Amino acid sequence: MGALAAGSLAAPASAADRMVALDAMSLANYHQVMTKVLARSDRIAVPSFRFGLVMRNGVGASGGSGTTSADLKADLVGVDAAMMRQLAHLAFADFIERLRATGRTVLGWNEISASEGFKKLDPTPAPFLKKPFADSRTVAVVSPEYLPLLTIGPEAPLSDRSPFNLGNARALNAMSAALKCLVMIPSLVLDFATLTGSGHRVYGGGANVGIQPGLFLVPLFTHCNWFHAKIALAGEGGRLILEDRVAVGQAGQLVQTGSFSNNAEIEEWNAYVRSNMWWTEPNMAAPSRPTLGYNYSTYQYRVDPGLLQNAVIDAARATHGLYMGVINANRPA
């Protein structure tokens, strides 16, 4: 006869303490691939801009070969597709403004949309929702209202097609070859909270999960792709890929919307065990011994639209500023 462990919510250490601050983000936080391609042309076309938000996340933990479990789910609320497209527009406008400030020639939409390659593009319906394989997050991705949402192989796992599908890649190559330009597609994705868990243990008794609210740039999902080609069938490309989580700030309030556990039942049993009444008063009716310990909770991160817009603009400015530094460092001879 022994005490039981209960599933519990454990407040994690401040998420910002384990992230890079937005004003401290640098190229050291990015993986750079084939930046020399940026020097192939002074002309740049930006046919799409991808903006995403994590809409749902969850974490689970267990201990004692499954006898104790904890589960937490969280949703982002107060955001719709129209708001996301407006945020995508603001981020895209910042990118184009900074790109023009580098002195590069930024092609207009009429020229881009009239190109042969553009006509061959297969856009992804927006908003695009994706729960990547072996990932608890569900991400919504959009483009500005007036731009197509384009997906290519390097966008995996936020993709609606196989990495071996070369249709859009060849269309972008055709666009680059026809317009004699670089083609760039940035992607900016933010999450709303950091979730932690004690994992799934065979011998450990307890199971803990926790949540820390706060927007941050998502590694891997946040990046910038570029392409250059002389013919449609073959080209070259490069990328800047965020490798670290970058804290952006708060844009709303975290609210617990549900909780379900048998912690009180477990504590009653543990108090009975610790009291030794089972030995000193063997004829006393004992409380029922729980066979499992569980703790389930749900949360909502309720967005303030104004705060979210400010946070997205701040994240876009910081991210795009680094991109422009790489573009300026790789100019045509």
List the predicted regions and their residue ranges.
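A structural "domain/chain start" motif
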Residues: A15-A333
